Amino acid sequence: MNLFRPLSHRLSLPSTTTTRDHHHQQHHHHPPPPPSRTHFTTITTSGRWLQRQFPVLTTTVFFSLFLSFPPHPPRPPQDHHRPTPARDHRDPRDHLPPTRTRRDHQHRPPPTTTTTTIKDPQHPQDPLLLPTKTLQEEDPHLLRPTRDPPSAKTHHHQDPPGGGPPSTSSHHHHQDPPGGGPPSPPPRPSTSSSSSHQGPPSTRPPPPQRPPPRWPPPSPQKISETRAGSENTAQTLFSHSENKLFSHPMGEGGEGDRGTAGGGEGDRDDPPPPSPPPRPPPPLPPPPPPPPPPQPPPAGGSARRRRRGGGPPGRGGRRRGGKRRRAEGTEAAAADAEEEEDGDGDEDEDEDRAEGEGREDGGEGPRGAGGGAGESESESGRAEGAPRSAEQQVGVAGVLGLLVVRDGLHLDGPERAAGPAVAAADADDLHRVPVLAGAGPGARGPRGPVGLHGAPGGGADAGLEGGKVPEHGRRGARGGDGARGQHQRGGLGVGLQQRRGAEGAQLGRQALGAAELGEAPAAAGDEDGPQRGAEPPAVGRAVPEGGARVKVRVPEPERGALAGHVLAAVHGGEHALAVGARRQRDRGPGPGAGAHRVAHVVLAAEAQRLGPGVQAGEGGLHAGEAGRAHDGARVQHGRAELAAPGPAHGALGGRVQADADVDVVVPHGRAVRGPVLDGVQHDEPAPRRAEPRAEVLHGAGEAEVPRREQQHPLGVEAADVGAPGPVPGPGVRVRRAEAVGEGGEQRREAAAARVPGRARGALGGLGAELLVGQRVVEHHHAHVLGVGYLPHPGGAAAERGAAARGDVRQGGRVEGERRAPEFGEDLLVHEGAGHLGRAVGGEGRLGGPRRVGLAGRDAAEAAVGRGVLGHGPERAPEPVVLGGGGGGGQQRGSGVRSGPESEGAALAPGPPVLFVVAVAVAVPAEGRAGEPLVLLAVPGAAGPGRAALLLAPLGRWVRAGGGGAGVAGGAGEAGLGAGAGLGAGAGLGAGGAGGPGAGEAGGGARRRRRRRWDDEAGLLGPERGQAGRGLRGPGPRGGLGEPGRGHVGRGEEGRGVGPGGLAGAGPVHAVAHQRRHGAGDEGDRVRGLPPLGRAGPGDRVAEREQRGRHLLEAGGPEGGRGAGGRGQPERAGQQALEDAAAGQDAGVRQLAGHAAGLRGGEGGADAGAEGLDGRLPGAGVRGAARVGHVGVGPAEALQDEGLLGAIVAAAHGHGAHRVRQGPERVLGGHGVPDVRQRRGHAAGDEGAVAVGRVDPALAELVEALVGGLHPRVLQPGHGLAGGPAVDEAHEGLVLLPRVPHLRDEDGHGPGRGAVAGRGLADVVLVPEPLAGVPGAAVADAAVGRRVGAGPGLPERGEQRPVGRRGPVGHEREVVVGGAALPARGPGGLRGRGRGGRGGGGGGGGRGPRGRGGRRRRRWRPGAGEWGAGPDSFVFFSLGGGRGRGGRGGRGGRGRGGGRAPRGGGGGPGGGGRAGRGEVRVAAAAAGAAEAAAAAEGALSGAAPAGLSLRGRPAVPGEAESVLVLLGAAGDGLDGDGGGGVGVGVGVGGDGAPGAKRPRIEPPRGGGLVEQGLAVLVMVTTAVPSGGGGAAAAGRRDRPGGGGGWGSGPPPCRRCGHRCWLCWWRRGPRPRRRPGLTDRVPPRGGPSPRGCRGAGRAGGGGRGGCGGGRAPGAAGGPGLCRCECCRGRRPGPGAGPGPGPEDEVTVLGALMESPTGGPGGRGPGLVLLLVFVV
């Protein structure tokens, strides 16, 4: 319920609810139909599970939205609601206010609608009547009292299909009421966009169709789909059974109708739950009605509302919530708890998740465009309307998801990517993540049947694609991401939206339009928004996405029939061809692909058939629909026409409205004509066959062709599609962004978010492409991250596109690979990775082969905790992401190859000494993406693993993943997740970024890896172990994950590698030792392995090969050979994973050993393996090194410039600079590729040092982060921003930006936004004393002393705020009581809960609570060994105390040992124990005193000579210590649950100092985030033991895990994902509603605030995710409810991969990474995390 009310909040981002609602809104606005379809299915699979997962998605999306929405709070709603009758209601931008208007409209039409509504709910045809629909839409408000109470629920459950409008209104209103309905029903509804649908029903059903604009409608639809589709799918049975089935049947009086209530989708879906095949007329009829089109969102809302109890939209929202609770019963209890908090509660969450896959995935939609199909819009970040602002807002979110904060899309994208990806991953975990939309049980399992847009009910309902697609699919295709959901915007719902489809169409069209709107708003064709920016903005449907808005109008008579027939036809017969094609396609690349393609193909074909007129039709009307000029296309698309068509649309009479709604309503029973058939048959199969057409349609992700089939079929040209400025770059960008199979959304997202940097927009492209959308998430995973299976057309399309476009690389994958995942990944790599890799690191900026992207993407994906693994593995058994593709396969070698691709591999030849990752985890409250304040530097070159760990989150950005993905995904996803070097190695995949990796990679990788890593140390384990178990949870993956993460991960491998091994000899150590022992000054210094001891790659390779059979292979270009197996997606992926595991283990070990100058020898190797994940060595090191290269610089250089300087230089010079200004300066004058040159240049010549090479992705990331961070953060005087203020505020903090490069490059002064003028420099704050100190020294110093406190270290436990001057709050709160930590000893850490990540943390934090605790204990011993190995990884875990506690496993990481849920380490604040805001580093080896002395010495100036945190002499460049520079360490977070972002220094596996983990907590409850502080967490390789370390501390637990972030959000109990969003949101919120989290039932998870699905609020889990159980948390079954993870599988959230998951994730991943990044495996990863909010 809160969903909607917060909608407005969301719009304004005023409240948590807002965020959540925002998320919902995202969902609602999201092109829910397609996403709904897909997402619903996915979500539906396990309602609760999804809830848990989606919460993440939702959270993330919300976060993204939240971040992006604040600037345009109104717009998203507007977009969604576009209620203004005068304006095209499809114009989301106008919806916010119009929304209210719409609400009024709702009120107005209700009378008429009332009659119809009441009747319609059951009579689909009646609802079909536009008037009825409209009225119904409106009716809910009016009818609510009458109809809602008695039949609202029933109607909502039944009405949505027949009485779609009521459902719509009810749902939307309900949605509104939940959030704002009760408080402000009128405004709320309008804000909720639900009203938009309802209020402006009069205006037109487009609201439903415009669900995208008015996300709530999509949400409802989505929900409906989710509810219906989900219900109708296994998820429906599973999740919705809990929710709808239990709640609805009971509340609704019947699930069947309840499904109907879902806008017919529900009905249609509803039967599926009971019996997937049953796509009974009841379901069909309801869905078909035009009202359902508008209803889809309402349906979603209905579902939502149903979940809420179906109370009246306005008033019954809450009441309904209760009612829903009663009705929902099981689901309601937990869900309601959440719902209560969220207003939507679990149901909503679920809906959100279900819908969130699309909606949540596109959840940014609300913020992005506040509208636009949630998915579509979100995808594009809906940057058009709100997205634009989102771009600004996305800053933080960007980091989060994509770490691309620059573009609104980023936040949106990443979150969404994470969300959808997560959701997809979750769904995949549920067996169908591949296509978020095509996740019906039928589709879900097969993932083909349901088709992408087949959405939830896909498989279950209507042969999966038959009815599903039409009804849901149609709608999904059209509105949600359903089919071609990604492209949904491109004439997705053409033929598929028929009647029910109309609803779908409306939803699709409007939702898509709305989604498009996010883009469309900018482009005129908002309604058509689904098309990604309107072909021509004016073209109604705007096939910006390479799709043409094909509005096939259905004969008026048929309209009624449509309700019954079209729906059935669409479902069963109308689009038999389309359906068949869809199915066929589903059979091809994947269910999703088929569905996607079909819907979109049908639409495309139809559009094509109709001709440009149809596509471009005047005012968006397709030529064929001249009579319907007022139709949604025109109205929706032609924003300009909005006003006139708007009323016509809504007010023009139900008829018109219905028509508008019906996107491509072909006479029912009549197959879509040739084009559709052709398109479907050809497009459908072709996509699978990689036919050129697909290429054209899909546009290979290049700017060549809008990869939207529809686009191509429609003949929409790139110029046509993306040309319209409204959707900046929708055309070209869209085209390129569209990439594979995700074109529309991705393109839209890319275009929207990347509009500014559309050509790849330094970060925009990266972010946009990276997170283009929910589908995009999926697609994006496969695409951008190169981890997902591109089940939707993405895969096939990608394949086709590659083939068509002759993309050799793609061709390589495509050529018989046809393994959607791998192929998709490959293509994705090129497209997505290309987007990401290209943009980010891969091939230079965006250009060049994208293979790199794959690895990076993989790593990123894994790191991001994307559903990549969940997605990839689940999505495609072939863990394309897992081993194939990302990482090992590095699809296309992209990952590893990426590394070797020179860019990546070359970059990371040796263990990077310093990984500089600039991650701007800015969660600007304002929502403006400021410059990223996050700069991650891993001085110490923790093994690439660690760097990867760091990068994992950035992985996609930094192809370090590419080795980052390669690294993290070393084995593709597995790489990240498994070998992932990043994943496992860096713990990123395995843990840390691995979290996501494990979640993502963890899933597949986890699965294999789990076995493997379990055995092999579960590189994946640490982060993903729990994630695996939690994230993957119950799934095969889950099993994998847990061991991996929980036991192998952090504990075993990480620790197994030996406290000394990894920690001692880990990459960090190895590097350090190498350095120390002169393994190669230069190479050793930054070059990653190659520089290692100057042994060149050859040496390293030899060593690597010798040590890790896959080091080179697994890590190398083939890297995926084992991991991804270029040709064998599944087996290769698995094999790769295994190989990667073995190779990674060996390779990593070797890497650690060798890369570490072999200093670690076995230990190093082990550590390396652990840290680097065999792949890391190859791709890992290469990628990681590559990534690491980013951050790694010669120790000397580091010394010279200081860690941060190196980091900045690296990030800036390499990435940021290159991306921004070109790496010439820093990198030696040229692009990313020349790692060595760069490195030499940067490190040697320029002294950028530390920057062996910054992946373009990383650079982009940094750049974007820096550029996208909240300005507030970076503003001078902010205390965080460079400038005197910062310096002053942070007496000791010096902005590394002082690094000459930064300064010069930026032209800013040394301390100012030197980095790429993005203020990166501003972002990097290094204690002045540390400025010139080598990374280790810096880390030590940072650890040893309070950053601002001067040499003297505060007493341990004394976190004496140096004076929270400036926004930063406690500028030097980071009191690293080095001694204190040691004093705390292992136990201390555990007290801190570092145990969590760090202690239990290592796997503990990550692992299930129990495991966590155990792990913690395990690590505890490790912690005990700080001095030994684990100790070596002293890391600051921001939020060290926080007491992750909650998650014994995840929580274990945390909070006070977090063994106890949340209280383990002192309860929620357990971690707080470390003293909020107190940053203390434990000197691992040296013990507290020694460490303190060393740290103090280092800080005091002895840094170079000072002891490292370990207490042993610091070795320049040795990143053993964690330098956590917290811009501010207030109690902030602590207040919330444990405290603020505390920098917890987890030393030792257990993060023994964990308790003492220095936690810098911002004074404000919000914590750093709240404070907008920058937290520079530099976890040096000192966190080698996978256990401790930020990752251990917080990664798994999310940002604050176990102290990890001290106050970081405690890991979600469910997903273990520390949701900064949640945490951040919760920070203040818990303060406001202290009991919120704590009181949340375990399953419910913290409510609005914590992970929604956090199984337990994590001890109240600091909000955020607090709560999720480790497994659940990461995933597994429930969606993480984390605000950031919401709706996403927490898997990522576990998902250490911050990427899309959420900035928090990023931070968490980063934090986690360093420590447990590799699950404790990537000790050598130093994170310089500047967490700025």
UniProtKB/Swiss-Prot annotation:
UniProt feature, compositional bias: Polar residues: 227-240
Biased composition (Pro residues): 179-189, 202-220, 272-299
Bias type Basic residues, positions: 21-31, 316-326, 1408-1420, 1444-1453
Region Disordered, residue ranges: 1-41, 71-394, 437-506, 520-548, 882-907, 993-1141, 1223-1242, 1348-1475, 1585-1608, 1630-1665
Start-end of Acidic residues biased regions: 336-354
Highest rank taxon of the organism: Viruses
Compositional bias ranges of the Basic and acidic residues kind: 77-97, 135-147, 355-364, 1078-1087, 1100-1112
Biased composition (Low complexity): 113-131, 190-201, 495-506, 893-907
Protein name: Probable nuclear antigen
